Amino acid sequence: MNSIINERIAALRAHIAKENIQAFIIPSTDPHLSEYVAPHWQSREWISGFTGSAGTVVVTAKEAGLWTDSRYFLQADRQIEGTGIALYKEMLPETPSIPAFLSSLLQKGDTVGIDGKMFSADEVQHATVMERPTGNAVGSGICLRHEVCR
């Protein structure tokens, strides 16, 4: 399974490099922001192999991380082992937030990609405001399922 996950991450990295995007955020939601999503919309599970109901994956050219809560620490650790995805345990003091993680890796003017259908308008606005001090933009035109998993 891990070789499949590694291939998927490599395909995403190739796609975002082609689109001049430096990081991509993959949530656990669907276009309706449902708590339980249909298999077609389980992009975070598809890219990471992590089957828990809550988590967010961030992929950059060289780094990948999964943020999830304490219900899933053990499960996530097992499921992402060997994938190159680091586990970030939410709500622990040593765990960087996703914006802090991105700020440590991105340069001024870099673009953070999302599938705009998978985030609320408020989440997109919040991300845009949070990234603005470093000059980063949020791009919302990539559909992971249609453009990467061909």
Descriptions of predicted regions:
Residues 1-150:
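Terminal domain-start leader segments
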